[in-house]
């Protein structure tokens, strides 16, 4: 499916809307991912579940920045799922396994927040989530820089 057709489907379903987001705002969102990653790392020694949740939040923020750089904003319906779908479409098969992990973490995070009795996040899970988040944030930063090589981002 072409990118235009894919994006139009999401717009028609009211899951996405065109919106120009300033590069300065995108840079701030990316900078927030760095804080999220640091917090997730520190939380490992305190609470695995919250570390996992914060690592996922870093991925979500990076994914949102990626959607913003494309000129769109997720609407109020299914924002997290939409961000995963948009990043999957544009990053393609090269990062398929990482995007699948992002989606898996999205589902686990949902259970952790809304039905915590259904999930037990281990130290191994939390460390794996942090590693995936670090990798994902780096990829998104590289993609944003690649799309705007003329900008000297400070992230």
List the predicted regions and their residue ranges:
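Terminal alpha-helical segments
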Residues: 1-155
């Amino acid at each position: 499916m072409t990118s235009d057709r894919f994006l139009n489907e999401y717009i028609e379903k009211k899951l996405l809307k065109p919106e120009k987001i300033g590069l300065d705002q995108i840079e701030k969102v990316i900078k927030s991912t760095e804080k999220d990653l640091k917090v997730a790392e520190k939380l490992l020694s305190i609470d695995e579940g919250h570390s996992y949740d914060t690592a996922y939040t870093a991925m979500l923020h990076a994914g949102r920045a990626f959607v913003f750089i494309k000129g769109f904003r997720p609407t109020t319906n299914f924002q997290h799922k939409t961000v995963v779908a948009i990043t999957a479409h544009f990053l393609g098969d090269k990062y398929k396994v990482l995007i699948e992990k992002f989606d898996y973490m999205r589902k686990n995070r949902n259970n952790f927040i809304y039905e915590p009795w259904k999930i037990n996040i281990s130290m191994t899970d939390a460390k794996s989530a942090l590693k995936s988040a670090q990798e994902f944030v780096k990829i998104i930063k590289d993609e944003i820089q690649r799309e705007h090589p003329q900008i000297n981002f400070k992230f």
